[in-house]
Amino acid sequence: MGEPKKSASLSDCGINDQTWNVVIPILYFLLFPAALLLNVVVAWICSLMKSNSSFMVYLKNLVTADLLMTLTLPIQAASMLPKASSGLQAFACRFSSVFFYTAMNMSTILMGLISLDRFLKIVMPGRRFPCQSLLFSKVLTVVVWMLLIGSTALPIIITTDQDPANKSNEFCMNMKSVLGVSWHDGAVKITEVIFWVVCILIVFCYVCITKKVLESYHKSRSSNSQKKSQTKARVFLILAIFFICYVPYHSVRIPYTKLQVKINPGCLKAKLRIVKNLTLWLSATNVCLDPLIYFFLCKALRQKFLESRIFKWFPPITGRNSEMTSGTSM
């Protein structure tokens, strides 16, 4: 299908394709500097900390996934621009997009593992499970990385090897072989199942954690309403960020993919593509929000940040530091 026919079809659907092809890349370009700064700072701080617990192992891997996702943002944005070269689009389809999705899926899984780790330590403090060992967490993260790369990233890179018939909105799908299209469809379905399982796990774990912490305050007859409010706020922050960033995208991903693998275009497909791109950008904003979660919820990381050279020109504020690091990490 030629380009003029495509434009007319989109116009008939009430969609200004050229506008969206500029707006969405700009959103990614605006996101990149803040994401890079925050993730580089957090990665540097994490490099100064020892991996002496399963929580720290998961946290460091989460930082790695977020940093990888951040580094793909400018390529993703540039390839979406109307005048992007076919070579850049092909590189984005075959490599940067693949690593973007791999990092995003890994980030989701690690958030689930962190919530489970917090659940076992706070809700079941008297028991020690094998999955809480340092060795298990290291092996598990390596296995998950290998499974994601081996089952989704590498096969998609290998099967995205065709010369696209035309420069259209389905440029990436046109680069996939028949096997590549089927693999893409299967990979999306599998990662969607993983996401919704992790979503349920996170909600369950943090609701139980909140209940346990509030019961602990009640049993100790603590009247510190500020700490209770902080506990509720922390849990709300985690759940709110997770739901706002990820749920919209994953809600439209399956219906869009079903239409994406079909040749015939339509208004529903065109509209879902815009919604998918916007919600995908919303998911990408998580790379800015995750570092804030690390800072507010991880006492050890917050302490290391306050002790870092970033503050060497400022006088120490002992009282404030003590107050900020007194909370329990979640």
State where each predicted segment sits:
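Cytoplasm-facing ends of alpha-helical transmembrane segments in multi-pass membrane proteins
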Residues: 34-47, 63, 70-74, 102-126, ...
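Intracellular effector-coupling site of seven-transmembrane GPCRs
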Residues: 172-176, 180, 194, 211-251, ...
